[in-house]
Regions:
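Signature of alpha-helical transmembrane segments in polytopic membrane proteins
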Residues: 1-139
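A solvent-exposed beta-alpha-beta segment
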Residues: 134-176
Length: 176
């Protein structure tokens, strides 16, 4: 198997696990907190449909904001993308629950609970990304490069050093 295929498999597995954990967190919150706040709680298939809807919402927002790019973008950019995706998802959660429920006892309390749940998800994602990038670095160490310079020295080494997690210039030679 090529390196790119292995990277894709690792990143895909990492993303599926993260998506499932975020969905399970929502399912727990839905079944034990949000659903109990409704005047007429959902039953059986309604609960499953709500969890599936949020699963799709998380997937779409992560895809839209680039939250699935572990190993392709820097950690700061990855966390920022995932934060935007989770905030967008939280707004969507609130709107979906408010619109499907018709009437909730306390809309302010619901918004506060969703905000706290989103903060928990954000902390989880940061920790999960840190662990994921550490494992990624062990499985796929930086590619060792030989830099060959011509008559005019360029700034390529500086650009490559910005991604020390992906590339490592081992030696630099010059021909004239």
């Amino acid at each position: 198997m090529s390196r790119n295929k292995n990277v894709s498999m690792y990143v895909g597995a990492f993303n599926i696990i993260m998506l499932l954990i975020l969905t399970l967190h929502f399912a727990y919150m839905w079944n034990n907190v949000y659903n109990t706040m409704l005047k007429t709680p959902f039953m059986g298939s309604g609960n499953k449909l709500m969890v599936f809807t949020i699963f799709l919402l998380i997937f779409v927002t992560y895809k839209m904001w680039g939250g699935f790019k572990l190993g392709y973008i820097k950690l700061v950019n990855l966390v920022f993308s995932q934060s935007l995706a989770l905030i967008t998802t939280a707004i969507g959660e609130y709107l979906i629950i408010a619109l499907t429920a018709g009437r909730v006892d306390s809309m302010g309390r619901l918004a506060g609970l969703i905000a706290v749940s989103t903060l928990i998800d954000l902390v989880f994602c940061v920790l999960y990304d840190l662990v994921g990038i550490r494992i990624y670095g062990m499985i796929f160490p930086p590619i060792k490069l030989l830099q060959i310079n011509g008559v005019h020295k360029n700034h390529l080494r500086y650009k490559i050093s910005n991604r020390s997690d992906k590339y490592e210039v081992c030696e630099e030679i010059s021909y004239k």
